[in-house]
Amino acid sequence: MNELTAFNEQRAEIYWWLSSLLSAELTTEQLEQYGSFEVRTFLSNLAETPELSDSVNALIEKLNAVQGREDAQLELSADFCDAFLGSDKSSALPYASMYLDKSGLLNAKPAQDMREWLTKYNIAQKAEFNEPADHIAIELDFLGNLIVMTNQQVSEDEFEAYMSAQLTFINEQLLSWTPRFNEICIERDKFGFYAAVTGLLVTFLKLDVKFLAGE
């Protein structure tokens, strides 16, 4: 494994991690893991990247605050529901269609576009996650898989084509709406844990675009 493929694996893991945070409420066991040495080391290492430092430290600060809540898991689950599962007037709905399609309806063209990406690369949506294809967690899970597929390409031309596809996907399917999604999450998530997650997501996406574009 060379340095680039190893870095790609790290990128995929980060996208899968962010996908898991935005797909469902954290269980008690998962929340306890966020206090572990392993996870805290992962976050500390991530914060060593200067462009990510502020966003990661904001998330660490919220994690520390979560640990101090009386019923941490239940309260954080309520925060998740308030942040993402309400109406478009009260929550930051995690679907691209809500931000990119004038109809304001779920399962609009952005969802169709996402289904086409899934089909093109033969990546299946997880059967147990029954959400429209343009849910943020599905898009991030897809991106992680696309990065891993990139590492599996044999020729340099194929490898570069897959790297280019990642750049196109991030620009068209994610950065086209996640900054606004993050802004609304900041407004609606009173405790701020999930706003810290979406803030880190947008920061990481912008940094990743620079990497993929060779800047």
Curated annotation (Swiss-Prot):
Give the protein's recorded name. Answer: Chaperone protein TorD
Purpose of the protein: Involved in the biogenesis of TorA. Acts on TorA before the insertion of the molybdenum cofactor and, as a result, probably favors a conformation of the apoenzyme that is competent for acquiring the cofactor.
For whether the record's keyword set contains Chaperone, the answer is: yes
Subcellular localization? Cytoplasm
The UniProt entry's sequence similarity note says: Belongs to the TorD/DmsD family. TorD subfamily.
- Protein origin, superkingdom: Bacteria
Q: Which gene does this sequence derive from?
A: torD
Q: Which NCBIfam families match?
A: PRK04976.1
Q: Which organism is it from?
A: Aliivibrio fischeri (strain ATCC 700601 / ES114) (Vibrio fischeri)
The Gene Ontology CC terms held by the record are: cytoplasm
UniProt KW keywords: Chaperone, Cytoplasm
